[in-house]
């Protein structure tokens, strides 16, 4: 199911004071600055095996929200994992953590927002949780919500 991106500023105006807008100032990395889709979540800390497994599945235009607990010590997503998500139909990634291969990420047709970069690899033990509510930036991202992302920020809506 494809969900068309909408301007987050317009969503804020439409929703009003109860809007769920992420307060973290995430940076744009992927080639697609505007993206939207149903939320799937992963919570992991400096380990990207679980999120790679999720991105190996059909994304159906969804958005994978990855809560890496704000760690910038290792990158959770690099060019290989981002390309996997793109190839499997994910519209975007929202990462409370770091990425690497930033120059290559800018060429991939997928939305990617993250805190920053670090060239260091993550571990790959599979530690983490999937499809659980995750909280960062003053927002709870719940599986099945819809996330809208653009240059102004991220808005989350419960359908």
From Swiss-Prot:
Catalytic activity: 4-hydroxy-4-methyl-2-oxoglutarate = 2 pyruvate; oxaloacetate + H(+) = pyruvate + CO2
Enzyme Commission number, as recorded: 4.1.3.17, 4.1.1.112
Single biological process term from Gene Ontology: regulation of RNA metabolic process
Positions with a binding annotation for a divalent metal cation: 101
CDD domains cross-referenced by the UniProt entry: RraA_family
Domain of life: Bacteria
Cofactors (names): a divalent metal cation
Record-linked SUPFAM superfamilies: RraA-like
Cofactor, free-text remark: Divalent metal cation.
Record's keyword terms, sorted: Lyase, Metal-binding
A GO term for molecular function: 4-hydroxy-4-methyl-2-oxoglutarate aldolase activity
Top enzyme category: lyase
Pfam family, one: RraA-like
Binding locations of substrate: 78-81, 100
Function comment: Catalyzes the aldol cleavage of 4-hydroxy-4-methyl-2-oxoglutarate (HMG) into 2 molecules of pyruvate. Also contains a secondary oxaloacetate (OAA) decarboxylase activity due to the common pyruvate enolate transition state formed following C-C bond cleavage in the retro-aldol and decarboxylation reactions.
PANTHER family: 4-HYDROXY-4-METHYL-2-OXOGLUTARATE ALDOLASE 3-RELATED
Assembly description: Homotrimer.
Family: Belongs to the class II aldolase/RraA-like family.
Protein name: Putative 4-hydroxy-4-methyl-2-oxoglutarate aldolase
């Amino acid at each position: 199911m494809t969900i068309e991106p909408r301007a987050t500023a317009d969503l804020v105006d439409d929703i009003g004071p109860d809007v769920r807008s992420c307060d973290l100032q995430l940076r744009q990395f992927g080639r697609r600055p505007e993206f939207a889709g149903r939320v799937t979540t992963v919570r992991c800390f400096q380990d990207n095996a679980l999120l790679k497994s999720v991105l190996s599945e059909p994304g159906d235009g969804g958005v994978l929200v990855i809560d890496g607990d704000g760690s910038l010590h290792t990158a959770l997503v690099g060019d290989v994992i981002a390309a996997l998500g793109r190839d499997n139909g994910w519209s975007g990634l929202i990462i409370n953590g770091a990425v690497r291969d930033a120059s290559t990420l800018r060429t991939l047709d997928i939305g990617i927002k993250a805190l920053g970069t670090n060239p260091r690899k993550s571990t790959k033990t599979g530690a983490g949780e999937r499809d659980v509510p995750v909280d960062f930036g003053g927002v709870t991202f719940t599986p099945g919500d819809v996330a809208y992302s653009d240059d102004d920020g991220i808005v989350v809506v419960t359908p």
